[in-house]
Amino acid sequence: MAQIFNPNPGNTLDTVANALKEQANAANKDVNDAIKALQGTDNADNPALLAELQHKINKWSVIYNINSTVTRALRDLMQGILQKI
């Protein structure tokens, strides 16, 4: 007989959440490091450091939006399943 439920599938909600959390934490650290690099008196108007900060903030924003979208999609999925029960 075919196995209906496999308790150890490749992707679970926990693995997705952990992967997103790791990426968000790394992006947050990158933004904080870029801000610290700008805090010197000579670095405040350095175009290269400002561009790097902007890039890090954009990357953080994209990861945050992906995290929000995935979380919302999973919530909607669970609501749909529960409504049909």
Curated annotation (Swiss-Prot):
InterPro entries: T3SS_needle-like, T3SS_needle-like_sf, T3SS_needle_YscF. It comes from the Bacteria. One of its GO terms (biological process) is protein secretion by the type III secretion system. Changing residue 14 to V: Shows a constitutive secretion phenotype. One of its GO terms (cellular component) is extracellular region. SUPFAM superfamilies: MxiH-like. It is found in: Secreted; Cell surface. Its main location: secreted. The keyword Repeat does not apply. Residues 13-41 form a coiled coil. Changing residue 83 to H: Shows a constitutive secretion phenotype. The keyword Coiled coil applies. The N-terminal part (1-11) is species-specific and essential for export/assembly and the function of needle. The core secretion machinery of the T3SS is composed of approximately 20 different proteins, including cytoplasmic components, a base, an export apparatus and a needle. This subunit polymerizes and forms the helical needle filament. Forms a stable heterotrimeric complex with PscE and PscG in the cytoplasm, blocking it in a monomeric state and preventing its polymerization. Belongs to the SctF family. Component of the type III secretion system (T3SS), also called injectisome, which is used to inject bacterial effector proteins into eukaryotic host cells, facilitating the establishment and dissemination of infection. PscF/SctF forms the external needle filament that protrudes from the bacterial surface. This is Type 3 secretion system needle filament protein. It comes from Pseudomonas aeruginosa (strain ATCC 15692 / DSM 22644 / CIP 104116 / JCM 14847 / LMG 12228 / 1C / PRS 101 / PAO1).
